[in-house]
Every structure is written in C-alpha cells, then in structure tokens.
Amino acid sequence: MLKKKLGYKEPWSPCDPMYVDQLLGGWMKASGDGPTFKRRSPLSISAMRAVHPLLAGVYMENISFDRSDRPDYHPVNVRLEGSDKLLTEEEIEKYLYDNNRTLSRRDWIQNNKRASGLFVADVAIDLRTLFCVSVNQHEPELTKEKIEELKENGWIESENIFGRCLVLPKDKRDEIIPALAHGLINWRITSNQSRTFSLMETLAVAISDNASSIPASIRAKLVDNGENPKAIPIIDEATGAEVFVTLPCAAYIQTESENVDALKNAEQRLIELMRAFDYEKQL
C-alpha cells in the first residue's frame, strides 16, 4: 500500500569532483546497501561575528516579505471563507474592482530583529586538498569506477600528507582559481527584504598563512573609562598578515593606507598564493 506521507531524506549527491561545486563544497552519500562516501570541503567559512561586543548591537525594525516584482511567478490563492474552493482569476479581478482593493504580494512583518555594527568572518583554504581527492578505499571519497574515470580524464596520480590522491589537471585549476578568489572577495547580497537596506561593504581584508596573525590584524581594543568602557576598532599592518584596506574603512577606523584598488589587490594576491602551491608534488 502506498503511504501518503512525506519525509525528509538525504540530498542526492553525485560524489563527482569534476563538478566544481562538488570539488570545493565536498559531499556525503550514505546508502543502506553500500559504503558511505564523504569528502570534506577544503574551505572552512566561519559565521560573521562582532569585532567586539561594544561595536555591534541588535535593533528592532519592521520589514516586508516582498514578492511583487514577479507576480506571475508568485500567484496568490484566494479562497472563500470557510471553504476550500479557490476563486478564479475572473472572480478575483471582479472582487478587487467592485471593492476598490488590491491584492498585494507583500507580507508586513513587525518587530523584526537585525544586527548592526562592525563584523568579521574567517575563511581558511586547505591547499593540500583544494584540488586533490583521496583514492583511499578504507574511508572512501570516490568509488573505484569514478577513480578510473578521473584518470581517463587527465587527473594526475600523486600523494599528499593524507595519502594517495588524484589531482585536478593544471588547465582546470587555472580556470577555477580566479573564479574562487573573486567569489571569496566579491560576495554579493541578493536579499531585498530589509526596509533599511545596508550594503555591508567590506572594510578590510587580511591574508596570511599564519592563523594567529589574522585576528591580530583586524581587532578591537577595550578602553576602560570607568562607567562607560569603549571599544576602538584597529587595523594593524604590522602583525605579519597582508592587509588590504578599502576606502569606506576610513569612515570607521583611523587609517592612512586605504586604497581604491584594495579588493582587486586582495583578489590578485589570493590568485598568486593558490597558483604558487605545488598541488602535484606535495611530498
């Protein structure tokens, strides 16, 4: 008998590193009739957090859930009260015309919370596994058939600290690296829900292979003035990290090194670092 119930199951994954989103995002596929295939993403991206608790806050505002830009893609169903019957388009139009009403695709949401202030987020790129997939079959990332398929498509047999692996060909790496650097630096906001829209502009980018130098380069300092302590944001270029400061940063932090091409320079530096790594001869 067919059960009339819906339930959430595991998202389908091809476990195929020839797809760039799979290669960079990783995968996990667990089936009851076979082994579990799992690849961890070489990218670790933290949540945004306040530079200092005193430099951020939570506010209340009214927002609208707006779907009025494409009414044909977001139809509104209208039913008679106490009935499951849907009104036809002609009946809806007649009602609106007779009663001088409109049928909005906006939902008014009151007392919504939003955060404001100075925030930071960390991104770690594991170059050892960025373009390498393991061929280990004890904790497999790939099926044996997929391993042979990758070899036929030019993937290079190599070895890294985690064991034997296959490396994406250089021409493909050279295509992905600029796109990855661009995506990490030039992220986009696609939501239109906030009535008090903020660009959330990037003020500074710090790049280093030393994790300790990153939080030291973009930080805050607590100034205790008795009853009213304050936090001062600081951009420090002497911590060992390469710091790229944008023009808007000068409005919030005292600096003399802001540059109109800061984000372009940061993107180019990421490209240089990723291209300089020897993916094929790690050992």
Regions found by a protein language model. Give the residues of each.
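RNA-binding basic/glycine-rich loop and surface signature characteristic of RAMP-family CRISPR effectors
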Residues: M1-L283
